[in-house]
């Protein structure tokens, strides 16, 4: 696999980064989660995503909200929301890795703020479903590239 650079050029001594490439999760769900956790503290984002996995709190869907039901108790002034469990588990894994990276570099893991979170569509994996009468139908498995940068705040 090719080495993929970060899309942002943020430099500094008080940063920690983490990324995951070609995850088999929904691109729309991962984009909504990235928009939601941006500018939050890492521990707050981890707690909220754990509640999403437990189906206690929903992620507000701001972009991909056509035919999405209203959910009660969404933060901000949003109505539509869902519980993207699989994508939330992937984000939890990346945020835990970032906390360990920050601890290794000597940052305080209690005061980390997410300053950059992005999710982009990755490479599409193409395959075929065998069908009746010797036919085949194409299927495309979408992948996602996620990158998160955190900064230690005072």
From Swiss-Prot:
Superkingdom as given in the UniProt entry: Archaea
SUPFAM superfamilies referenced in this protein's UniProt entry, alphabetically: Ribosomal protein L22 (SSF54843)
GO molecular function: rRNA binding; structural constituent of ribosome
Complex and partners: Part of the 50S ribosomal subunit.
Entry-linked NCBIfam families: PRK04223.1 (NF003260), uL22_arch_euk (TIGR01038)
An individual GO BP term: cytoplasmic translation
Full protein name: Large ribosomal subunit protein uL22
CC per GO annotation: cytosolic large ribosomal subunit
Keyword line: Ribonucleoprotein, Ribosomal protein, RNA-binding, rRNA-binding
Family: Belongs to the universal ribosomal protein uL22 family.
Gene3D superfamilies in UniProt: Ribosomal protein L22/L17
Record keyword Glycoprotein present: no
Record has Acetylation as a keyword: no
Stored PROSITE patterns: RIBOSOMAL_L22
Function per UniProt: This protein binds specifically to 23S rRNA. It makes multiple contacts with different domains of the 23S rRNA in the assembled 50S subunit and ribosome.
Xref: InterPro entries: Ribosomal_uL22, Ribosomal_uL22_CS, Ribosomal_uL22_euk/arc, Ribosomal_uL22_sf
């Amino acid at each position: 696999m090719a080495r993929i650079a970060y899309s942002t050029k943020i430099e500094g001594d008080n940063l920690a980064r983490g990324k995951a490439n070609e995850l088999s999760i929904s691109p729309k769900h991962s984009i909504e989660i990235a928009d939601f956790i941006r500018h939050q503290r890492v521990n707050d984002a981890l707690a909220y995503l754990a509640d999403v996995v437990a189906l206690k709190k929903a992620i507000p869907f701001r972009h991909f909200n056509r035919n999405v039901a209203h959910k009660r108790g969404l933060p901000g002034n949003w109505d539509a929301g869902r519980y993207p469990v699989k994508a939330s588990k992937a984000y939890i894994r990346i945020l835990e890795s970032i906390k360990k990276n920050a601890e290794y570099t000597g940052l305080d893991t209690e005061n980390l703020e997410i300053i950059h979170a992005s999710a982009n569509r990755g490479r599409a994996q193409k395959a075929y479903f065998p069908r009746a009468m010797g036919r085949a139908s194409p299927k495309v498995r979408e992948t996602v590239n996620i990158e998160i940068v955190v900064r230690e705040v005072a």
